[in-house]
Amino acid sequence: MNALVICSGGLDSVSLAHKVATEQKLIGLLSFDYGQRHKKELGFAAICAKRLAVPHQIVDIRDVGRNLSGSALTDNVDVPDGHYAEDSMRITVVPNRNAIMLAIAFGVAAAKKADAVATAVHGGDHFIYPDCRPAFIDAFQTMQNHALAGYADIRLYAPYVNMSKADIVSEGAKYATPFEATWSCYKGGARHCGRCGTCVERREAFDLAGITDPTDYEDADFWLHAIQTRSA
């Protein structure tokens, strides 16, 4: 399977890139600049592509992103602190983001004669993001089968769609993913904040996987409070 991986530079997509490079044929990484405040993640995608010796392309869709207003990831809206599964995290939804990126990726994959587009959506995303759920993945595959009928037969490869973040950490370790060379924090500062939903989820995932977290957090202990508050 010749696969094009959508890679943000985050833990999930970098782990997926290493998985595909080991198990299949990785033909390249595709990233998107949609005006996200944590744009520094794109640099980690570039590092991953260089490490795996594959082409890396960043697609500029900032004009599109400017029209998807109201999200804490793109607008002047505070990124909330707390657990990823809290209702407050819905402010991080960028409407139709994955659908837009996947549609572009399928077009690129078809032009490059690839067999698959790989995406790292996972089970932990289901609560907040509708375009990360299994039903969406299945529906998008059906739509692309019609969109490319007679031209290309491309599979949407989403191996993590029913896996937890901890599962991805465990599998990423198996494929020697350099977790320190990935970026998760939505606030986009010099260091991982340790308080936003993605930082809390990241720290919790390493703990559940029983693997040492190499990440440098500004607040390394907040995740415990976030988990306790959610469980209360």
UniProtKB/Swiss-Prot annotation:
Single GO MF descriptor: ligase activity, forming carbon-nitrogen bonds
CDD domains recorded: QueC-like
EC number: 6.3.4.20
Annotated binding of Zn(2+), by residue: 185, 193, 196, 199
Key words, A-Z: ATP-binding, Ligase, Metal-binding, Nucleotide-binding, Queuosine biosynthesis, Zinc
Sites where the protein binds ATP: 7-17
Pathway connected to this protein: Purine metabolism; 7-cyano-7-deazaguanine biosynthesis
Top-level class of the enzyme under EC nomenclature: ligase
Keyword Nucleotide-binding: yes
UniProt cofactor(s): Zn(2+)
Matches recorded under InterPro entries: QueC, Rossmann-like_a/b/a_fold
One Pfam short name: QueC
Cross-referenced SUPFAM superfamilies: Adenine nucleotide alpha hydrolases-like
Cofactor binding note from Swiss-Prot or TrEMBL: Binds 1 zinc ion per subunit.
Name the UniProt record assigns to this protein: 7-cyano-7-deazaguanine synthase 1
